[in-house]
């Protein structure tokens, strides 16, 4: 089993010019938790997926969930039901913690 305590979760994020490079804190068939870094201007295209939670640690941007778009900033949390489309655009460098369960 991987570490269970991460003192500085933001420092785990990896930033790359070609897009997000998720860093898994845990990855099992039942559950995934990851840290993602996006550079300003990068995006995650709108796509359907399983139920998920996104908690923003750094930066500002926009997140689309279904037909709604929300401003994201440190401390914001977005919860998305299974099958609902979601995506995001980073206005500044963004770091978020994501988790999702089994489909």
Language-model regions: role of each:
Residues 67-83:
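Short acidic-glycine-tyrosine-enriched beta hairpin
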Residues 82-103:
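Ligand-binding loop in jelly-roll beta-barrel domains
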């Amino acid at each position: 089993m991987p570490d269970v305590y991460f003192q500085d979760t933001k420092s785990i994020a990896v930033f790359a010019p070609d897009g997000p490079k998720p860093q898994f804190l845990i990855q099992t068939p039942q559950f995934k938790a990851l840290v993602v870094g996006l550079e300003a201007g990068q995006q995650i295209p709108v796509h359907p997926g399983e139920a998920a939670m996104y908690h923003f640690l750094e930066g500002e941007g926009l997140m689309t969930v279904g037909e709604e778009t929300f401003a994201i900033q440190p401390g914001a949390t977005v919860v998305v039901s299974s099958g609902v489309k979601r995506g995001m655009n980073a206005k500044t460098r963004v770091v978020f913690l994501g988790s999702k369960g089994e489909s």
